C-alpha cells in the first residue's frame, strides 16, 4: 500500500465585529496572532495563514512585540499572508469599486511594511507580472 502524505496549514478566520464589538474583536485577533506565533515557535514545521491585512495594522499598533514575531515568521516563509483583502468582505453587497479599494489599501500596507515578500505579495494581491 502506498503511503499518503497529508499537509496541514494552520489558518485563522476571524470576523471581528460579527460576534463582538470592535475592541473585543481586536482582542480576539491579537490573542489569536500571539497563539499562532507561540505554535510556530513550538513546531518548526508548522505554517500559518491569515488574510485580513487590517489585522496586521492592529497588531503593529497594539501589540508591536507580536508584530515583530510575525515579521520574523513572514521572513522565514512560515507565516503566509493570503487573500489580499483589507478585511474579509461581504461579497454579496459591495460594488466592484469596494473590492478594488480593498486590494489597493492592502497593497499599499503590504508594500510599506513588508516590501516584496519574495513575490508572495504578487501572488496574494493578484499583481503578478507587474
Regions found by a protein language model. Give the residues of each.
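Carbohydrate-active enzymes and regulators
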Residues: 1-130
Amino acid at each position: 500500500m502506498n503511503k499518503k502524505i497529508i499537509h496541514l496549514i494552520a489558518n485563522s478566520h476571524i470576523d471581528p465585529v460579527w460576534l463582538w464589538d470592535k475592541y473585543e474583536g481586536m482582542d480576539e485577533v491579537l490573542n489569536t496572532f500571539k497563539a499562532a506565533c507561540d505554535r510556530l515557535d513550538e513546531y518548526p514545521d508548522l505554517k500559518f495563514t491569515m488574510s485580513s491585512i487590517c489585522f496586521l495594522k492592529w497588531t503593529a499598533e497594539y501589540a508591536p512585540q507580536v508584530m515583530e514575531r510575525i515579521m520574523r515568521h513572514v521572513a522565514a516563509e512560515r507565516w503566509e499572508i493570503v487573500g489580499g483583502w483589507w478585511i474579509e468582505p461581504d461579497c454579496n453587497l459591495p460594488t466592484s469599486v469596494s473590492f478594488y479599494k480593498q486590494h489597493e489599501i492592502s497593497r499599499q500596507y503590504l508594500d510599506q511594511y513588508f516590501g516584496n515578500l519574495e513575490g508572495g505579495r504578487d501572488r496574494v494581491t493578484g499583481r503578478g507580472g507587474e
